[in-house]
Amino acid sequence: MEVVDFKSILSNGVTITSSGTTGTPKEIFRTPENLKACNAVAIDAQKLTSKSRVLTVTRMTHAGGLLTQSLPAYTLGAELKIQQFNPYTFLKDFQSYTHTFLTPAHMKALVNTKGFKDSNLAGKFVLGGSDPVDWDLIYKFVYQGATVMPNWGMSEIGPITINTTFNDLVQVLHYRHVLKGEFILGDCVYCDIKIVDNELYVRGSICYQEGWLATGDLVESIGKLFSYKGRKNSCNHSN
């Protein structure tokens, strides 16, 4: 298990590195106050408790690995295991746990294993993110019994920020139809948002800076439901 000084992180803050999926990788410092706000959202959104058992297979230097479930689990005193992702052993390992965070690449790798179609993911919570999660992946994991939460966040905010929780196939098909197959951001929002020229702006205590952050992500809203339309050429900050 990777050794992480969670106590020091909570007391002193932490610098995380962006994955580079939205541009040049950069370092973002998260203050103790910001981490407290992010923890509160992550715990509420994913229904994490002291009895949860979290299996982390993503890097601790990234927001997805550290902030989505690992730091919240430590804060709650929940069971936590950190290990490298192995698609051939993951499904067996995950049987002893309740929550995990997977990228779409992880999810695709699991779907392509021999044992996936016979797996029982009932009672398992799978947070998906870092890249947009396509509908086929959401459907296949829910079909196996999992609760799936495709989530939008960034190294600068959240990372649990905008999402939807899926736990039955009718719901998956309905949302997919409403969004006409476009990637989903979600309809549960944990910060202030506005859309300017189709670009998503975010603001709130889970953001590393004050004022509005121009995300560089293009979105479309259907009522309170948001879909992802792609990236602008660059990501700028605005107060």
PLM features: residue spans?
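Charged, glycine/proline-rich intrinsically disordered loops and linkers
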Residues: M1-E2, N167-I184, L225-K232
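Conserved pre-ATP/AMP-binding loop-to-beta segment of ANL
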Residues: E2-T17, K47-R53
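Short beta-strand-to-turn element immediately C-terminal to the catalytic PLP-Schiff-base lysine
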Residues: F29-T31, T161-T165, V196
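Gly/Ser/Thr-rich phosphate-binding loop
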Residues: H99, V111-L179
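Conserved ATP-binding/catalytic segment of the ANL
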Residues: Y201-N239
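Catalytic cores of nucleotide-enabled group-transfer and carboxylate-activating enzymes in metabolic
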Residues: D168, V178-G181, L185-C191, V196-E199, ...
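AMP-binding/adenylate-forming
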Residues: K26-T49, R53-V111, M149
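Conserved adenylation A10 loop of the ANL superfamily
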Residues: N12-I28
